A protein has these predicted regions:
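Conserved beta-strand segments of alpha/beta enzyme cores
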Residues: 106-108, 159, 177, 518
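Histidine/acidic-residue-rich, glycine-tolerant segments that coordinate divalent metal ions
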Residues: 133, 140-193
Length: 566
């Protein structure tokens, strides 16, 4: 594990912002590191406002999309809302279909079967639309590369509106409208929206056309916040505003489906991390284990008792998903060892009976042990399909592009992607991918990194600091929970390991003459010897509040621990 202290901004910038906000220098440092350099920046950051959302008509083709939907309503056409089977796709379909149904009855939804149809727009879905009299399909979280599919639909006189956030290819599909802030010819001010976020901009534009206010659309933000959390997009700009108000909806008046999911886990107040680890996996489990339609049913259900029934079924899917995840991860580790591939620059594994719904999770698990770009393949029909996950700084999408001659199709982002290939090309691809990674990955990318925001003393940890850090929420990419470093720390004699395998570490630490403070380090049990014999050591940690028997105290959430000589 390597520790990297983020570059410190100039002293002039720090002093100027610290004085303007009446905060300590290191708090000003945290803000500048997040792009907050002026009083107005800080005001917008700490006080998100719906007024900060951009005009949806700034997005390329938004006027065309709205005009086509309004024409469909005027002509009593049937509209099919189509989306991917993951959290971003199912929340987007739920959002757009629910909004349209509140104005117009001829709306239906379609989620492709993960195993029968695969990712994105499918020919089977277009045939379904044709057979059932749909003349307009709104595709969410997919479609930006579906050139052949859109052409096929056009032959059947079916129009497409694409709402996507993935990188476009060199050629765009021949759709009526393509809403994607990553289009090169799109001047929309913010290009980090998720698929559900693009869907929200569509209903915002439709609402604006109908003289609805942005406040009228707030009830839909529980869906948007869930998608933002699940899709791991930056929590900056519009995403911060949408996530901030979406969390308020989740914690005050969520839709029955989300309320039922929260009810399952019996947690009173959820933050963005809870959405990532509690709500998102359960919504995802429907598409992974059964069918994404189950998630849409849950998220669009108005009756709470019925929603509870749906949530109970999804809870079972999630339990099944965990069992599969555990088994396949174990088998993948065995394969790496048997093939003596521990020292490779990439991980590429395959087994034909691995469940396609969990291979992305398994890829992430493998990276925790073998920190390198990872692809997990399984059999899908007569082809092999994989999920890819990457390590910080390495663009797995570009690596796949470099090996495209061996692939049938691929798509995704810098850190996560999916692909299919012919069985006979698997070994050729595996070696080509290894060669590409070996030649392009930087040495430091092969070691997990802890990015430290600032070095502080325990005396800096005050109630005021805790209050300020709470206002940094919601956390996420480009606004991660601040990580601090403190040196010359000693344990007060209470160090112990926790857990059945003694894998966790519990400390009560001091620095010089400071008051003692509790610290917990998950997975750090093996480092307990560093804390013994009155040794001084260094901690990397984030700050949290621990509530016990009605008392609230500050606790260090340890990221790592190392000797003071480093």
């Amino acid at each position: 594990m390597r520790w990297t202290l983020k570059p410190k901004p100039s002293e002039d910038k720090i002093k100027h912002l610290a004085q303007a906000l009446n905060v300590e220098d290191f708090v000003a440092t945290l803000l500048i590191q997040r792009g907050i350099e002026t009083f107005d920046d800080a005001k917008n950051f700490f006080r998100p406002s719906l007024e900060h959302l951009h005009d949806p008509f700034l997005m390329k083709d938004m006027d065309k999309a709205v005009a086509r939907i309004e024409l469909a309503i005027e002509n009593h056409e049937n509209i099919l809302v189509f989306g991917d089977y993951d959290v971003d796709g199912t929340t987007a379909v739920s959002l757009v279909s629910a909004y349209l149904k509140s104005h117009y009855p001829n709306i239906a939804t379609y989620i492709p079967d993960r195993y029968d149809e695969g990712y994105g727009i499918s020919f089977k879905g277009i045939d379904f639309a044709d057979d059932n009299g749909f003349s307009l399909i709104i595709a969410l979280d997919c479609g930006i590369k579906s050139i052949d599919h859109i052409a096929y639909a056009k032959e059947k006189n079916i129009d497409f509106i694409i709402c996507d956030h993935h990188r476009p290819g060199n050629i765009l599909p021949d759709a009526v409208a393509i809403l994607d802030p990553k289009r090169e010819d799109c001047d929309y001010p913010y290009d980090e929206l998720c698929g559900c976020g693009v869907g929200f901009k569509l209903i915002q534009a439709l609402g604006k056309n109908r003289n609805e206010t942005i406040e009228d659309l707030v009830p839909y933000l529980d869906l948007v916040a869930t998608a933002i959390a699940a899709d791991i997009v930056p929590i900056t700009g519009e995403n911060r505003v949408l996530a901030y108000f979406g969390l308020q909806v989740i914690n005050s008046d969520p839709r029955p489906g989300i309320k039922a999911l929260v009810h399952q886990v019996k947690k009173k107040v959820l933050d963005i991390t809870d959405v990532v680890f509690i709500i998102s996996p359960r919504i995802n489990a429907a598409g992974r284990i059964k069918h994404g339609n189950h998630a849409v049913e849950l998220l669009t259900e108005f009756n709470f008792e019925q929603a509870q029934q749906f949530a109970s079924e999804i809870e079972q899917y999630n339990s099944d998903r965990k069992d599969l995840d555990k088994r396949i991860t174990k088998e993948a580790f065995q394969q790496i060892l048997e093939n003596q591939e521990e020292e490779r620059f990439s991980t590429v594994v395959f087994q034909e009976d691995w469940h396609k719904g969990v291979i992305g999770i398994v890829a992430s698990r493998l990276i925790e042990t073998y920190y390198r770009p990872t692809l997990v393949f399984t059999k899908s029909g007569d082809k092999y399909a994989a999920s890819a996950r990457s390590v910080k700084g390495f663009d797995v999408y570009n690596a796949l592009d470099a090996c495209a001659e061996h692939l049938e199709q691929f798509g995704g982002h810098m850190y996560a992607a999916g692909m299919t290939l012919k069985a006979e090309n698997y070994l050729l691809f595996k070696e080509a991918f290894e060669k590409c990674v070996k030649e392009t990955i930087q040495p430091e990318m092969r070691t997990p990194e802890i990015e430290i925001d600032a070095e502080i003393n325990f005396s800096d940890i005050t109630p005021k600091l805790i209050r300020i850090l709470k206002q940094f929420e919601p956390f996420g990419p480009q606004n991660m929970t601040p990580v601090f470093m403190t040196t010359n720390v000693k344990d007060t004699g209470y160090a112990k390991t926790l857990g059945a395998d003694e894998e966790h570490l519990r400390l009560f630490v001091k620095q010089n003459n400071s008051e003692g403070i509790a610290a917990i380090g998950f997975g750090l049990g093996k480092k307990i010897d560093i804390t013994k014999n009155q040794n001084t050591f260094q901690l990397a940690y984030s700050l949290a509040e621990n509530e016990w028997n009605g008392n609230v105290s500050t606790q260090l959430m340890l990221k790592d621990i190392r000797t003071n000589e480093k």
